[in-house]
A protein has these predicted regions:
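Short hydrophobic/Thr-rich beta-strand motif most characteristic of the beta2 strand and flanking loop
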Residues: 51-59, 66
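Acidic catalytic/metal-coordinating carboxylates
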Residues: 59, 85-88
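Non-catalytic signal-transmission and effector/linker regions of two-component phosphorelay proteins
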Residues: 1-31, 35, 154-160
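Active-site beta3 strand of CheY-like receiver
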Residues: 70-81
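Short amphipathic alpha-helix used as the core "switch/output" element in two-component signaling
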Residues: 87-99
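Alpha4 helix (beta4-alpha4-beta5 surface) of REC/receiver domains from two-component response regulators
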Residues: 88, 109-127, 135-139, 143
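C-terminal output/effector regions of signal-responsive regulators
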Residues: 154-194
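Conserved acidic segment of CheY-like receiver
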Residues: 25-38, 43-47, 75
Length: 194
């Protein structure tokens, strides 16, 4: 993957809000590479409450299109995607001339093994699915951000558990059923997806 842009969204000459204790991710753009609508909705709510903008890619091809256009502040990459492994994208981003500042992997299956494999591929950290609380989401991102991108002073730890829209879960289940109805359903992908 070649990234021909060396700028992050925060390099643009517009006004960029600074992080605050209440909105510690304000001013950041998070690229969520996630095929599950339910998990994407959860990430959207976490970003919204944290002050971050979110862009979504539901597959590797879409993620590559995003990365050719801009460099996000943070990338959250699901390891099991319909058109390949998120590990390959993590490796590509890790080798890029202008690396995304924070790359986190996410998976709901075999968490310890997935985390170890993702870190070996070059991820900075790992977010298990589902993310337990708003504080856990914010803390994992802030832990890996460069000092100059973090909010100054103490910040409240919000233990709020955000509930994504149940309609998104129904859509994910309908998608899985449709895949099972194929002549040759992609069982490996379905195991990771569900």
């Amino acid at each position: 993957m070649e990234t021909d842009t060396s700028r992050t969204d925060t390099d643009l000459p517009f006004f960029h809000p600074k992080p605050t204790p209440a909105r510690p991710l304000q001013g950041l753009t998070i690229l969520a590479v996630e095929d599950s609508r339910f998990a994407s909705e959860a990430l959207r709510l976490l970003c919204l409450r944290s002050g971050a903008r979110i862009r979504r890619a539901d597959c590797l091809a879409s993620a590559h299109r995003h990365l050719r256009t801009y460099r996000p502040s943070v990338a959250v990459v699901d390891l099991g995607l319909p058109d390949g492994s998120g590990l390959s994208l993590i490796r590509e981003m890790n080798r890029a001339a202008h690396r995304v500042p924070v790359v986190l992997a996410t998976s709901g299956a075999e968490r310890e093994a997935a985390a170890r494999t993702a870190l070996e591929a070059g991820a900075d950290g790992f977010l298990p699915k589902p993310v337990d609380t708003l504080a856990a989401f914010q803390s994992e991102i802030l832990r890996h951000l460069p000092e100059d991108m973090r909010p100054q002073g103490p910040r409240p730890l919000d233990a709020t558990v955000l509930e994504p829209d149940r309609l998104a879960l129904r859509e994910d289940l309908a998608h899985a059923i449709a895949l099972l109805d194929r002549d040759a359903p992609p069982m490996g992908y379905l195991r990771r997806f569900l």
